UniProtKB/Swiss-Prot annotation:
Stable up to 40 degrees Celsius, but activity is lost after 15 minutes incubation at 60 degrees Celsius. The lineage of its organism: Eukaryota, Metazoa, Ecdysozoa, Arthropoda, Hexapoda. Residues 36-595 are extracellular. This is Trehalase. The active site is at 335 (proton donor/acceptor), 532 (proton donor/acceptor). It is found in: Membrane. Residues 1-35 form the signal peptide. Substrate binds at residues 181, 188-189, 225, 234-236, 299-301, 333, 547. Inhibited by sodium, potassium and ammonium ions, and by TEMED. It is a single-pass type I membrane protein. One of its GO terms (biological process) is trehalose catabolic process. One of its GO terms (cellular component) is membrane. Optimum pH is 6.7 when incubated for 5 minutes at 35 degrees Celsius. Active from pH 4.5 to 12.5 when incubated for 5 minutes at 35 degrees Celsius. Optimum pH is 7.0 when incubated for 24 hours at 4 degrees Celsius. Active from pH 5.0 to 10.5 when incubated for 24 hours at 4 degrees Celsius. Monomer.
Amino acid sequence: MASSCSIRCGSRNILVNAAATFLALLVVLRCFANAEKPSPCQSDVYCRGELLHTIQMASIYKDSKTFVDMKMKRPPDETLKSFREFMERHEQMPTRYQIERFVNDTFDPEGSEFEDWDPDDWTFRPKFLSRILDDDLRNFASELNGIWKMLGRKMKDDVRVNEELYSIIYVPHPVIVPGGRFREFYYWDSYWIVKGLLLSEMYTTVKGMLTNFVSLVDKIGFIPNGGRIYYTMRSQPPMLIPMVDEYLKITHDYEWLENNLYLLEKEFDFWMTNRTVEIEVDGVNYVLARYNEQSSGPRPESYKEDYLTSQSFRTNEEKDNYYSELKTAAESGWDFSSRWFILDGTNKGNLTNLKTRYIIPVDLNSIIYRNAVLLAQYNQRMGNESKVAYYQKRAAEWKRAIQAVLWHDEVGAWLDYDILNDIKRDYFYPTNILPLWTDCYDIAKREEYVSKVLKYLEKNKIMLNLGGIPTTLEHSGEQWDYPNAWPPLQYFVIMALNKTEDPWAQRLAYEISERWVRSNYKAYNETHSMFEKYDATVSGGHGGGGEYEVQLGFGWSNGVIMDLLNRYGDKLTAEDRFVATFHSNSTPQPVVVSTAGQVMTGILALVISLAAGFIGKMRCANNAAQ
């Protein structure tokens, strides 16, 4: 019997037979097309319409995001009236120079929504610095602590009073932004920012950011991709509940939890209601989550780029489906990556082959499982027994589904699932081991899972890259592909391995941490900048590719490094060394210093050392079995 999947679309269920996958795409797209798609937001200035199209296609600015972050000088109706008169004066064909003058006359520069803000809870020397023994790394962490003040943003009260003049979404409390072109808060970035802020003892700032987030859930129904109205049809990986968990571990502010638990549940319900899909495997139906944005038109912040690439499609329906795929990939946080390409059942192709809506991601579902577990715990604390049972049931169902649909025993990892071709996607991503972090597997078989995952990582040669773990092994030119290494993915792998309590996995977690910290430290020393992403192939190199230049700042990069320095600060050193011995106690360990000419020898020794660990582990397991 051929396996099949049931895809929920609106109120209907569509049964997709794997033997006829060429019909699957047609059926699903037709279902999506039955209802007219809404625009990214209701603004005829920032999200849709002739004004947006004319200005963005004129390429006044190098970055399309610049215009849609500007403030209108007059109300929207007056702005649109001025635009119509402008177009009439120039017979509907203004020059680029004339369009630029119109924009300068009609809009204030980007960033006009903010005022200076000096956080009251910032401290010059947070306690975690004392746990970092290496002087250079301690100074590095101290400087990262200072960067929070540069990344802090507080909105002017005028944004609240005259919200229609801005594309930014008003929130009552100051925020820490990623940096560079990202002038507003971003959803999943904020998890690592919060981790760093908590180490910096900026508890009031964190509480304000969490309060901002739940206010958005209350207002919009979920947390958007970022703090602009053009993001309000898409979200990002649902990291709010894990953020709250980090805050509660440090502050024990259960009054905040009691007041806002219903909003955490509301966000969870959004994902259950709007982002789930039924899949049948071996005659059993499972429910898992996917990313799925459904608005029309190009992304306003990348309007020209999207519009031009859409011209390879013939019909408006095909173009709108392509736009939805672009925005769905943005919702995933991985915009863009060959991870979301489907071409003849493979990950080959280019942006026109994006099929993010038809891929069940390991990481998204692992996070949703963890959210259900945490909501059960929170309701237990509040005495809501019926809700405890509900979330425990959800978590158990999710764990079973992840095991049945995503785990590949022969590969030794969890794999994304392609619902068009009804296959697991056997391509390396750091997120393929994320269930180890969220405990979304049979803990009783931990040793078996860990052994297979370690062999999987060794097979994919993750330690052959001096600058970190690459995002994928594909050379597509997209920024979420090789050779870029992204901070959150390093964090996921390190924490997943460390949480197993397996000494070999924890050793590997330490060595990945050491390599990542040293690469970031080297880049910072040479440029006095923290980057959004790094080059996996070289220590100290920043990443590239994608739609925009590499960004400085940078929120999640700082948070990850601070967390690793707090965790391993009693062992890490700034110099380029390869650890000769490592134990789990707190005593600093002896190291062997390598010269630049010995780098490859050191890598080889490290790989051999790990391989020996794998072999020894398997022998011990075999002896025990005998």
